[in-house]
Amino acid sequence: MNLLQNRILNITEEFRRGTFTQRCSQLSFGILCLFLLECSITGGGRYWEVGPVSIRILLGGLAAVLALPELFRHLGAYLKKPAVWLTLAFVAWLAFCAWRGVRAENRMDVLITDIKGFMWLFLVPVSVAVVRSRDRLRTLLSWVLAGALIQAALILAVNAAVVLMDDPAPLCRWLNEHTVGIVDVVSARLVRVFFKSSPYMIVGCVVALFRQARAPKLRWRYVLAVALLFNALLLSYTRSLYGALGLTALISIIAVLVLCPEGRKRTLAFLLAAVVCFGVLVTVQEFALEGSYLSFAVSRTIGKEVPTSWASQLRSQLRGEDPGDSPNNGEMDSQRSYIEVTEKSDQLRQETKDSLNVYIQRSPIIGCGLGASAANRDKGVDEYFYLDMLARTGVVGLLLYMLPFGYVVVWCLRRRELLRECPEGAAVVCGLCTFWIVTWFN
């Protein structure tokens, strides 16, 4: 406690003695941490709004405004950074595509949504300006990890609450209406809980993995953290998240083994311990809430019914039930119906692809402008981000969008020795891979 108080006093004194620009930079960084914490927890961030302004827009705007003194102070140097001027080039192309969308009389509501969707780009210059040290980067990642763990705990709590409550409809409705996430009651014992911030839980796993790799011994807090995140991701029953988790894990594990060779054995022990703890956690849940989570996750992923998981079978044996007894017919019928809905969703996705391909073929190089939307989507939500980009901004727009991240990856590959000293940078790159993979389907 005294250590924490001393740390707060030191930060306060440092802030008091700093110049105006330094103070603004410190405040911007602090608000940026809160911004990412909020992003890591609350989905669309619309649980509190005043008109068009949400808490997320407020925090992001404050972080950007307070970063301006630092940006203007070294504007020439920042503009020479490829990540910054490549981002500015993409913003300029977006403005051109917005003009094309207005001229082509594309859907104005979709066009406005497109513009809002790219407002996060302001984070690039803000981060470049205020995250200028390894300590700040590490602190920022700590806030992301904390937010991911809070989100995971909330998902487990919502899952249990919906199963145990007599009338979970108000809770589900509130979460859906405020775009925190999707809560679908699959059956009496199974609930799909998908928060829109779920990709941050994969980023949390990456952060924990890299920190464990640098630790002198096995850190059980990281093991339990990853097990909790795995459990929450399982309850999403979302194929894109499962795929993103698998591919990001592969990339991150390879990066850790290359950059931190001295910690390879601890890393492998960490992964094994995390999987075991995840299995124990899921087993306890299946016993307590009587749901077969693992088998339904596999069923929804492959689109076919599979036998109940080993945890459910063990539960039946311990309760003295006949292992050969068939599961509750009503329960299984509900699960089958949900899998059928998934199949219909796949058909809708294929129709969306076909509709977007029409736009792409019409103008593959420069796109058809912002606001171009698949005809079979009344709300304009197309789900396929990269096809959206090709349809609306063309090949030029997609390349400009990918270039800043591509530059960062190349920069990291050419400076592997530096990353060995600062693995947080590699953690950021691996974490960004999560969003690249998830947005392929969403």
List the predicted regions and their residue ranges.
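Transmembrane signal-anchor hairpin modules in multi-pass inner-membrane enzymes, especially those
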Residues: M1-A98, V102, D135-R138, S142, ...
